[in-house]
Regions:
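Alpha-helical transmembrane bundles and membrane-interface segments of multipass inner-membrane proteins
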Residues: 1-165
């Protein structure tokens, strides 16, 4: 459900930008700090791998298939954070995938300026992917701590049992 909602928000915002703004047209939202800027990207984050459409299509299909398979597995385990993270990545990956498949490029529009530095323009799908990956890292850290606590508790139980015999 999260993946679908984020996909729809991503596609809806991209449609609004592409249909109502000329290329590179800007709308200041918060002064010069945050602007809506109509842009297109034929590559990945920060403009890398420009014009590698088939590479992105193949990689995205593999990633989406892996996430869907893993999400089905995760629902049986009752975990919450990792499935949410994967759903965000899935929604974002599908949003950019559809753009690439239908237009050969991705619609970007969120621009942030920090003084004289302009952060690369991005979109909702990119945000979902970055937040999802961040949550995957957080889940990995938390899961590692849970495993250490479980091992510690198990070793205490074993040593406590042996001492009572």
């Amino acid at each position: 459900m999260i993946a679908l909602v984020m996909f729809l928000i991503d596609q809806g915002t991209k449609y609004l930008i592409a249909s109502r703004l000329e290329m590179y047209e800007q709308i200041p939202v918060i002064g010069n700090f945050f602007l809506i800027t109509s842009s297109r990207n034929r590559g990945a984050a920060f403009g890398i791998l420009q014009d590698q459409l088939w590479f992105f299509i193949v990689v995205t299909i593999a990633v989406v298939a892996g996430i869907v398979w893993y999400l089905r597995k995760m629902t049986k385990e009752g975990r919450k954070l990792l499935p949410t993270a994967l759903a965000l990545v899935l929604g974002g990956a599908l949003g950019n995938f559809i753009d690439r498949l239908l237009m050969g490029e991705v619609v970007d529009f969120l621009q942030f300026n920090f003084g004289s530095y302009t952060f690369p323009i991005f979109n909702i799908a990119d945000s979902c992917i970055v937040i999802g990956v961040g949550l995957i890292i957080l889940d990995t850290i938390l899961d590692g701590r849970r495993e250490k606590l479980n091992k510690l508790n198990t070793s205490r139980e074993v040593s406590g049992t042996e001492g009572n015999e």
